[in-house]
């Protein structure tokens, strides 16, 4: 509930925004806790919605369907958001009417400290860090917002559809890529996506996401996600295979510059992705 506590404390006119909380088929006391927060903050437009279909994409699509605003922002339940998050996104879309989507900075918060084996490449699938400087600008070519800190104009979902429910984490399954798929659709038709550094979240990373077992499953399913998305494109698998082979060369070169523990995890990452991509 830490994320919700930060959301209800947003420094922005409560009459101008709403908060949709999607309970993705939980079996614990989530609903009771949320209803307690709603009762304590009656001045806010907070709404609880239950989504029985398990999966992050189902949950996000449910949030879209139950929201009313022209701009829809998304955060996950393992994040601490800055108190100006809503205001920063509203200002961005007001000042840049050409922007169709936006994303902010994501700063990892390793609850037990950052592991010595964590390199910036290995961190990407684990903690999803995102930083492109301190100024508002279009996202660099080939990049896009992180799923846990993004905002999209409703009209884009009307035009392009919502998040692909074949992708996205679901229960113990760690397949991701739903936001990659969505923003690739946006980029294909040329819709501008902006980076908003001060719309920032801190992504909490507990010890359970740093274990050998978890990271092995995560890296493999990153590859599975890449395979699913590649299969949908003309010559997509061939291009993905060629790209992956090239990444092995870069990986081996990087290992020469890393400390042993970092090299081991970098090789583990590459091996896991390759197995998932090639269907091994």
State where each predicted segment sits.
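Short, well-formed alpha-helical segments that are part of the catalytic scaffolds
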Residues: 1-10
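Glycine-rich, basic loop-to-helix element that forms the pyrophosphate-binding segment
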Residues: 3, 51-67
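A conserved acidic beta->alpha catalytic loop
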Residues: 23-32, 79
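Short aromatic/hydrophobic "clamp" motif used to bind/position activated sugar donors
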Residues: 72
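Conserved donor NDP-sugar-binding/catalytic core segment of glycosyltransferases
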Residues: 84-118
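Short, flexible, basic/aromatic active-site loop/helix in glycosyltransferases
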Residues: 104, 122-143
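A short, conserved alpha-helix in the catalytic core of glycosyltransferases
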Residues: 147-160, 166-199
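Non-catalytic, C-terminal membrane-associated alpha-helical segments of glycosyltransferases
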Residues: 217-225, 231-280
